[in-house]
Curated annotation (Swiss-Prot):
Catalytic reaction annotation: uridine(55) in tRNA = pseudouridine(55) in tRNA
InterPro entries noted in UniProt: PsdUridine_synth_cat_dom_sf, PsdUridine_synth_N, PUA-like_sf, PUA_sf, tRNA_psdUridine_synth_TruB, tRNA_sdUridine_synth_fam1_C, TruB_C
Catalytic residues as annotated in Swiss-Prot or TrEMBL: 47 (nucleophile)
Pfam families: TruB-C_2, TruB_C_2, TruB_N
Recorded GO MF terms: RNA binding; tRNA pseudouridine(55) synthase activity
Entry protein name: tRNA pseudouridine synthase B
The protein's enzyme class: isomerase
Presence of keyword ATP-binding: no
Annotated family: Belongs to the pseudouridine synthase TruB family. Type 1 subfamily.
Keyword Thylakoid: no
PANTHER family with a match to the protein in the record: PSEUDOURIDYLATE SYNTHASE TRUB1, TRNA-PSEUDOURIDINE SYNTHASE
Listed EC numbers: 5.4.99.25
Role of this protein: Responsible for synthesis of pseudouridine from uracil-55 in the psi GC loop of transfer RNAs.
């Protein structure tokens, strides 16, 4: 019997192009096995129907994944107008039908109405938790759980293609936006129904789909080639300000102490900390009132010195 390759410590970020038909977790596990990585996590669930950008965080990168969850995102969505499905997408059953002879002008007006700061009720078929279980588990049993509306921002909706009943839109939005629900809202504004037939995440936190890699492409590379595709852990927090500390101050941070710091930095956001030779140490909080730095999330000493 062939022995499985031993798992190894891998640290970094893989920009994965998730294929259609796989859950985000299944895609994550396939990537983890390709890298023989000990630890892996992803940032932001994509439905099985959806494809596109799924950042995978290996090892120490997982410590900073939460900061990517808050990032803005962009999607390309394909709608079928005139039909509602039980799940809001093509995986569900058609449960209602209405007019599909929508004009481009009507569709443009509806898209404009759903742009900006809006409130959105998350769909039942989602990974949001209720009493420890994802909502989709209740939905599959026909149980409807009351959901509170969320404040979201839809920065733009651009119409890429329109030939009713088919419409393709490009959406830029804040975290927590459900494109299925947005598509239903666009249709409702017109007085009809809609569901998604395709969804692709094209951007998140400044990363683009052009930077991503498919599972098939990764499988055709050797270990060194795959490792060379990993981005460093600090790309997840590159939007925060940065500073450099000397070795003594870094040591204090790593020991749970608060080194003195007197530079002009914002105190209301995490700060990236680097050593004098450019090594990423982690995130700290600048406590301006006492001129001290407090550790928030730090790289493991062995990993950060590798």
């Amino acid at each position: 019997m062939t022995n499985k390759p031993a798992k190894r410590p891998v640290n970094g970020v893989l920009l994965l192009d998730k294929p259609e038909g796989l859950s985000s977790n299944t895609a994550l596990q396939k990537a983890r096995r390709l890298f023989h990585a000990e630890k892996a996590g992803h940032t932001g669930v994509l439905d099985p129907l959806a494809t596109g950008l799924l950042p995978v965080c290996f090892g120490e990168a997982a410590k900073f994944a939460q900061y990517l969850l808050d990032a803005d995102k962009a999607y390309t969505a394909t709608l079928k107008l005139g039909e509602a499905s039980s799940t809001g997408d093509a995986e569900g059953e058609i449960i209602a039908a209405a007019r599909a002879d929508i004009s481009l002008a009507e569709f443009q007006t509806a898209c404009q109405a759903l742009t900006g700061n809006i409130r959105q009720v998350p769909p039942m078929f989602s990974a949001l938790k209720h009493e420890g279980k994802p909502l989709y588990e209740y939905a599959r049993k026909g149980i409807v759980i009351e959901r509170k509306p969320r404040d979201i921002t839809v920065y733009s909706i651009d119409i890429a293609e329109f030939d009713a009943p088919k419409a393709v839109i490009s959406v830029r939005c804040s975290k927590g936006t459900y494109i299925r629900t947005l598509s239903e809202g666009i249709a409702k504004h017109i007085g009809t129904f809609a569901h998604l037939t395709a969804l692709r995440r094209t951007e998140t936190a400044g990363f683009t789909i052009a930077q991503s890699h498919t599972l098939e492409a990764l499988a055709n590379l050797d270990e060194t080639e795959r490792d060379n595709l990993l981005l460093p852990c600090d790309v997840l927090v590159s939007h925060f300000p940065q500073t450099v500390l000397n070795d003594y101050a870094v040591h204090m941070l790593q020991c749970g102490q608060r080194p003195r710091f007197e530079e002009d930095l914002p105190s209301d956001t995490p700060v990236r900390v680097y050593t004098e030779n450019g090594r990423f140490v982690g995130l700290a909080e600048y406590q301006k009132e006492i001129c001290r730095m407090k550790a928030l999330r730090l790289m493991n000493t062995a990993a950060s010195s590798a």
